[in-house]
Amino acid sequence: DQQTGSRTFVNFDREYWLPERYLEGGRPEIVKPEATWVTVWKSRKLEIGLFLLWLTAAGTVYALRDKLVRRSTMKDTRWKDYPKYFLWITSIGFVGFYLLAVPSITQVLTWFHSILFEWKWELFLSDPFIFLFWIFIIVSVFFWGRGMFCGWMCPYGSLSELVYHVAGKLGLKRYQRHLLPQHWHDRLKWVKYGVFAGLLAVSFYSMGLAEKLSEVEPFKTTFLVGVWNRSWPFVTFWSVLLAASVFFERPFCKYLCPLGAALAVPSTFRWWGLKRKKECGPCAACAVGCG
């Protein structure tokens, strides 16, 4: 500073080579190792291509779902059922068990902290499937809301839905309920928002503790570690959720899932919601039940 005479020092990194005339034998060849995430992406080109095809197919089917429903009849529901079953099965087998590409609330918490404190692209690019999945989820949430991911593409949600449908086909349909009794449903549906808010608050105290508490999601037990590799508390919790899925449609998704609660926030700003038809009355029951 010319006025005060104080000095300010700045540190920075920059490559520097001496001129070749000062080096015996010329400048040496330096092979720089490529970033780890680049190596991972290159090594899984085929799976990435298949995953992108799956995402494209899912987006196309969901965009055309109204046309598929119109082509279906009460006796022939193949047009609306088969694409949905295909996405459920591939979500469980290919995306969940094979690619291990299971979006989780921990990734949402990491995203929050990265925005507030330090953003590192390498962290998000380290898993190509999770990275691509989240780009697709964010875009689809603002187009159609969380319904596409939660209802058609989530590996655990698909597993829970298939368990419910298979149980119905095996003769348990008369014992099944779409929802808990209405007075219970109206209260319990808010629990997942409390779980999400609690995990987000805890993460600012201790991210490690938040990650442990986030195992309220059974995703890790189901796909990443395997239920046979967990201790009895995890096995018990997982088994209770599975048993509940036999009799109630997606109980975890409706009442406990913090990821669904997190996605509900941007879903408020979706471009396309439930469509009203000329036959619609003023009851708005569909918006309350599915919106």
Which residues does each PLM region occupy?
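Non-ligating segments of multi-cofactor redox enzymes
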Residues: 1-289
